[in-house]
């Protein structure tokens, strides 16, 4: 090992909403290389967000940070923020998918309302129509099939596809 500072590299770029994510990916890839790790299997690059809209991405990150609760009010707050992200960018496939996952969670853990389950599937299908091979979206579909439809056999092939593309699988 050397005493060279790993984080001394300068990233001098013009920042705009259009270039911000590319610079973030470049920095993360440099850190990954310095650590000798790959952040995404097969590509060696950080997975890019599926939006170039900074406001939508900020909302997405806020929702993602608060996701994971099984408490009805918490899930509903997360759903509301994902809805804002999708409203800010109606083509933001990953936000649509995560919205679908949270609606599935609302159904499974709390309401058992078919309207929540069915809306979840609509968002997941919209997301997959935009990015059919996105591994996180395939994982979300598997979770929906498993918890929302009790289609355990249908969930397995989706999990297999997701596993091939998700980091750490």
List PLM regions with ranges.
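Acidic, proline/glycine-rich low-complexity intrinsically disordered segments
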Residues: 1-169
């Amino acid at each position: 090992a050397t005493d060279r500072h790993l984080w001394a590299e300068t990233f001098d770029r013009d920042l705009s909403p259009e270039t911000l994510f590319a610079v973030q990916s470049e920095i993360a890839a440099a850190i990954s290389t310095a650590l000798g790790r790959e952040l995404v299997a097969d590509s060696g690059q950080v997975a890019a967000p599926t939006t170039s809209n900074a406001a939508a991405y900020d909302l997405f990150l806020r929702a993602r940070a608060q996701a994971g609760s099984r408490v009805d009010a918490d899930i509903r707050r997360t759903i509301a923020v994902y809805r804002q992200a999708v409203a800010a960018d109606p083509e933001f496939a990953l936000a649509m998918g995560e919205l679908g996952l949270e609606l599935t969670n609302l159904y499974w853990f709390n309401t058992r309302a078919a309207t929540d389950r069915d809306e979840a599937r609509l968002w997941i299908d919209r997301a997959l129509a935009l990015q059919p091979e996105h591994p996180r979206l395939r994982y979300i579909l598997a979770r929906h099939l498993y918890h929302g439809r009790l289609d355990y056999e249908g969930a397995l092939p989706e999990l297999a596809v997701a596993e091939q593309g998700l980091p750490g699988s």
